[in-house]
Amino acid sequence: MSCVPVRGCRIGEGRPKVILPIVERTEAAILEKAAAFSTLCADCVEWRVDLFDAAADPGAVVRCLAKLRVLLKEKLLLVTLRTKEEGGSIPVSHEGYLRFLRTVLDTDCADLIDIEFFTAGTDLPALVQDAHTAGVKVVCSSHDFHKTPPKAEMVSRMVAMQQAGADLPKLAVMPQSRSDVLELLAATAEMTDHHPETPVITMSMGPLGAVSRLCGEAFGSAMTFANPGTASAPGQVGLDVVNTVLDSLRLN
């Protein structure tokens, strides 16, 4: 599996990198959380902008983003506007989504930006190019909160993300059975073994899929989300547990 270097962090190499989500609604609460996260044992902080009360105000987003960058110091900053269709909090038009992405890219504050595979559609390659021109790595994401697609479909989707130029394909799916969790892990292993051009980020959601968030080094998921107190998705595991288990399951 290849490696994506960002701020001295080598995503895809060794222990899965840990992401902490900021899900607070006000700027004051967001910045307070960022200051607390800056000292925790994690590699990356995700700001879920769709949960921000002022998400529709580009100026407020830019101002908050600049303050976040300072507070987080050398921790990676992943910026995400999760659309309602993919489990987020606010409806956003296609044009509004594109404007948001370009606003973030113009700030020089984000290390990584989440671009939804289906929301971006045919604009995905151009958006990836814009991000790379701005020096920002792309997490290209797809979420299914109802089911787990067949393995071949999951692999095909992540390969399509790679072909569009994404640095980190991300797939989150909901299991309805134990077999679904195994299907997600098998898709992850296939990407690692047969499509190693990029690292991938995968997870099976909910309590049934929680194990998939902890065994990334064995199966090939390069990053995992931990719950620092408030989860941003079902099945996220507490930060202390994540760090303990990731250390226990080290391959080297």
Label each residue range with its predicted role.
Residues 2-7, 14-17, 198-199, 219-221:
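Generic structural motif recognizing short loop/turn segments at the entrances and edges of beta-strands
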